[in-house]
Structure formats: structure tokens, C-alpha cells
């Protein structure tokens, strides 16, 4: 089969012919229709994440089951599927209370520890596949169906983690990126009172407004905290969702939080930032980390799209062979929303 392979961290992605995968016990193989080019893939390619190379990256798949191994139940040929890319045990105390991202027996990630979806076929543990719901036309919209499992499920979890309510003003840092634009969408879906997009790339603001932003703030001006306070009449924001998590964004967000404000970080590669306990006490601030989503939240996100309540923003779709060129555009922050590789 054709596959895009990362030979070593930081190296260009290359198109290769590799053997078709064969399912073993408890495994299934899916034909890949499309795979999103998400932030995790971007960091892995750049060498910012540990990846056992050579490796086929990618996890935001739309696929069709073509083979199952012994002992597999619940999947059959022809099923439309996506992937839950955290490989969890399903048995520890965290998995049993539907907090799989904290699994005590975590086995790694699809597209990092095992080969992912930048290929014509993907083999996974059967438990890592999630069936696509009726009402979601995954054959017609494979790119959009594939990115739901991360680009929408991750923001859905944030709304719960941060307890976003209709009275809240929400600011999204890195709002023009693949997770950011969908966070704007989901914040609007939960009826946040005001949604503010913060990004360095003003060219992305039109898409941010389309996704649900009421206000846009150009972070390149270097006065984000001040602008957020101005936008809220000095009261401050209720929730800051930070997909950048650099010291500058974290500190600007904390400075702009109002009473009872919640800061949520999802940027795993940010630096050390300063938070003042006295201010946290005075304003009763909360610092929160939110990591991916649970399987239940992925299923819910798929259903939301199937019902037409949300729709993924995939702005670039390119053939598998153009993976490296696409990631070069991602390197330069030239992609708004999500991009996807079209495989078959």
C-alpha cells in the first residue's frame, strides 16, 4: 500500500510502498478514505514529540472496515469508522469512570507508537475504532467525518472541564488553528454570552467570525490582556482556552480573567509562566489542564455533527502524496481551521 512515512524526527515526510497490514487477534483493518492533519501530527513530524521511527503518522481518520481478526465482535466489513487515538486499557480506575486520558496502563498513541492513518489502510486494536453514526454521510464527507474525533471532541471536553455557561465570556487563544476554530464553534453551541478569538494571524479572523467569534483580537499588537479587559468593560473574561500556552499567552489570559475565572491549557509544549497566588485567591481563579477527550465525548461529538448541530471546518483537502507540502504550510501557519489528506 501507499503510505506517508516519517523516517526520523524533523525529516520530510516521504511517500513509500509498504506491506498491507493484516489483522491479528483482537485487531481490525480499515481502508482509509481521509485523515486530518492535526496538531499532534504536526508536532511529531517536527520532532517535538517522541515517535518511534520509521512511522506512519495520523489519527483523525475516516475509514471502512475491510478485515477483522479472531475474537473481534462489534465490527464487520463495510462499517464506517474513526479512531480513538489514545490506546487505553479499559480496566483501570480511570478508564472505569470514563476518564481514559488518565489511563494507568496507557500504551501510547495511534500514529506514534503504532502506525496511523497517513496510508491507504490502517490496522488498530478493534477497541480503538469507533463506528460512525447513522446520519453522518462519511462517504460524501470523509475529511469532515475524520476530524471530528479530535477537532470537535477536544473542545467538547473543554466546555465540561471549564463549565462554560450562557453567562460566560470565553476567549480562545490560537483561535485560527484547527482546534481553535472548532473551540469557537463549540463555545457558541453551548451559548456562551460572548466569544473572543485571539490569534497572531489577522488573515484568519474572517474564518473565526464565521465559526462564532463576536470579537477578534490581533495578538501581534502585544496588548492582549489589556484588549480583553477593554472588550469586557473591565470585568475580565470568564474562561480562557489556550491552545498556544506560551508564557505570553498564559500570563495575558490570567491577567484578563475576571472573578471566578478559569484558565484552560491544552498546549503541551508551552514554557513556564508566572501565576500569583494572591491574585488567584482574591479572584478565586482556577488553572485547568484538559487532555483530548473521552470515548464517550468522541461519540457525542459524532452525534452532534450527524444531527447538524456542528460542522467541521476543513479548509484544505489534498491528495496523500502532498502530505509534506501541506505540513510545510502548517509550519508557516498558513492553514485556517483543519486540513486533511484525501486517501481513497
PLM feature spans:
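Rossmann-fold dehydrogenase core element
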Residues: 262-264, 275-314
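Cysteine-cluster motifs in flexible loop/terminal segments that predominantly coordinate metals
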Residues: 38, 85-130, 138
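Glycine-rich cofactor phosphate-binding loops and adjacent beta1-alpha1 units
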Residues: 162-163, 206-286
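Mid-domain Rossmann-like dinucleotide-binding core that forms the NAD(H)/NADP(H) cofactor-binding site
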Residues: 127, 136-222, 226
Amino acid at each position: 500500500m501507499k503510505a506517508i512515512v516519517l523516517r526520523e524526527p524533523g525529516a520530510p515526510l516521504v511517500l513509500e510502498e509498504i506491506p498491507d497490514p493484516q489483522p491479528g487477534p483482537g485487531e481490525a483493518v480499515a481502508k482509509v478514505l481521509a485523515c486530518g492533519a492535526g496538531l499532534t501530527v504536526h508536532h511529531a513530524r517536527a520532532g517535538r514529540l517522541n515517535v518511534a521511527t520509521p512511522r506512519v503518522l495520523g489519527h483523525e481518520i475516516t475509514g471502512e472496515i475491510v478485515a477483522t481478526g479472531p475474537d473481534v465482535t462489534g465490527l464487520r466489513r463495510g462499517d464506517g469508522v474513526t479512531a480513538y487515538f489514545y490506546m487505553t486499557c479499559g480496566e483501570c480506575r480511570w478508564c472505569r469512570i470514563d476518564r481514559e486520558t488518565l489511563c494507568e496502563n496507557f500504551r501510547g498513541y495511534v500514529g506514534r507508537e503504532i502506525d496511523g492513518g497517513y496510508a491507504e489502510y490502517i490496522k488498530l486494536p478493534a477497541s480503538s475504532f469507533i463506528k460512525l453514526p447513522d446520519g453522518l454521510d462519511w462517504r460524501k464527507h470523509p475529511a469532515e467525518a475524520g476530524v471530528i474525533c479530535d477537532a470537535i471532541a477536544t473542545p467538547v471536553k473543554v466546555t465540561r472541564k471549564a463549565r462554560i455557561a450562557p453567562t460566560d465570556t470565553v476567549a480562545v487563544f490560537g483561535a485560527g488553528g484547527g482546534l481553535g476554530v472548532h473551540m469557537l464553534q463549540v463555545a457558541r453551541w453551548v451559548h456562551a454570552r460572548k466569544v473572543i478569538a485571539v490569534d497572531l494571524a489577522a488573515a484568519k479572523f474572517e474564518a473565526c467570525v464565521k465559526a462564532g467569534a463576536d470579537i477578534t483580537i490581533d495578538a501581534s499588537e502585544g496588548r492582549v490582556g489589556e484588549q480583553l479587559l477593554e472588550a469586557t468593560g473591565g470585568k475580565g473574561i470568564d474562561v480562557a482556552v489556550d491552545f498556544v500556552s506560551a508564557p505570553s499567552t498564559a500570563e495575558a489570559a490570567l491577567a484578563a480573567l475576571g472573578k471566578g475565572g478559569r484558565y484552560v491549557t491544552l498546549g503541551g509544549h508551552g514554557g513556564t509562566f508566572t501565576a500569583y497566588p494572591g491574585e488567584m485567591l482574591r479572584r478565586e481563579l482556577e488553572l485547568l489542564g484538559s487532555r483530548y477527550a473521552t470515548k464517550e465525548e468522541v461519540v457525542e461529538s459524532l452525534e452532534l455533527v450527524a444531527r447538524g448541530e456542528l460542522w467541521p471546518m476543513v479548509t484544505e483537502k489534498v491528495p496523500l502524496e502532498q502530505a509534506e507540502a501541506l505540513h510545510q504550510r502548517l509550519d508557516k501557519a498558513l492553514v485556517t481551521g483543519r486540513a486533511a489528506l484525501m486517501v481513497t
